[in-house]
């Protein structure tokens, strides 16, 4: 049966995902940055209360995936911490300035991760050649690759995702970016073994007083009065589609 991974940005989201049938959680902070390394407090809380597998993301900042030596050193420390806390896997990715997988750094990541399952995230979609990148990641021992098929969303990139799947059984190709209940069946019919979804909604902040003339963000247009939340019904609907597909 296809596996359903839900992207969660808080303890509350993780509990919702677990209650509604998620098979695994990718744990992140900062949804507006596309996911950054969670805080130690969140990591410890989730590790204590969530029983399904949780893979924290290791990403020190938003933007591109070429990191300074200092940023990369911090990533390795975060990987060691995630390993010490007992998580079964993690999510990360590093590229060279030319858009190739940085194999030298991946070797260090794999050594720091040890027995943990490593997912190479959508840095893969920024690679110059996805098929060369996949071969390199297979050689590195990566467990899975999260990809939209190098398109804005996975529905548009499904043909490339299918080509990547055809390259072999490892790493597992996990489709993500815009995967929802209304298009999930297309991925299952295409033979995708794992899918990744935010299954989320933005809810208004409960703040009554709002200083409209001031922003805490460098982006003065940023909406600081909405909050991301996993929608339990969306997770349950997707899991139901997967179960019914398996029963055919």
UniProtKB/Swiss-Prot annotation:
Q: Which SUPFAM superfamilies match?
A: CutC-like
A GO CC term attached to the entry: cytoplasm
- Short name of one Pfam family: CutC
Subunit field text: Homodimer.
Listed A to Z, the keywords are: Cytoplasm
Q: Which family does it belong to?
A: Belongs to the CutC family.
> What is the designated name of this protein?
PF03932 family protein CutC
GO molecular function ontology, one term from the record: copper ion binding
Show the InterPro entries listed in the entry.
CutC-like, CutC-like_dom_sf
Where is it localised? Cytoplasm
């Amino acid at each position: 049966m296809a596996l359903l991974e839900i992207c969660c940005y808080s303890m509350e989201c993780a509990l919702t995902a677990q209650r509604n049938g998620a098979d695994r959680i990718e744990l992140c902070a900062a949804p507006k940055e596309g996911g950054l390394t969670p805080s130690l407090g969140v990591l410890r809380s989730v590790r204590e209360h969530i029983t399904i597998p949780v893979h924290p993301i290791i990403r020190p900042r938003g933007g591109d995936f070429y990191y300074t030596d200092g940023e990369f050193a911090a990533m390795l420390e975060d990987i060691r911490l995630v390993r010490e806390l007992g998580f079964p896997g993690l999510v990360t990715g590093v590229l060279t300035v030319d858009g190739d997988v940085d194999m030298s750094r991946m070797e260090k990541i794999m050594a720091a991760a040890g027995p943990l399952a490593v997912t190479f995230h959508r840095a893969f979609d920024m690679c110059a050649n996805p098929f060369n990148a996949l071969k390199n990641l297979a050689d590195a021992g990566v467990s899975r690759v999260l990809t939209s098929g190098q398109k804005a969303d996975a529905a548009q990139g499904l043909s490339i995702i299918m080509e990547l799947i055809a390259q072999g059984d490892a790493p597992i190709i996990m489709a993500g970016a815009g995967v929802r209940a209304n298009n999930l069946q297309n991925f299952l019919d295409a033979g995708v073994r794992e899918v990744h979804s935010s299954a989320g909604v933005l809810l208004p902040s409960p703040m009554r007083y709002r200083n409209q003339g001031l922003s805490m963000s460098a982006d003065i247009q940023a909406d600081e009065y909405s909050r991301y939340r996993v929608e339990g019904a969306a997770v349950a609907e997707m899991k139901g589609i997967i179960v019914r597909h398996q029963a055919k």
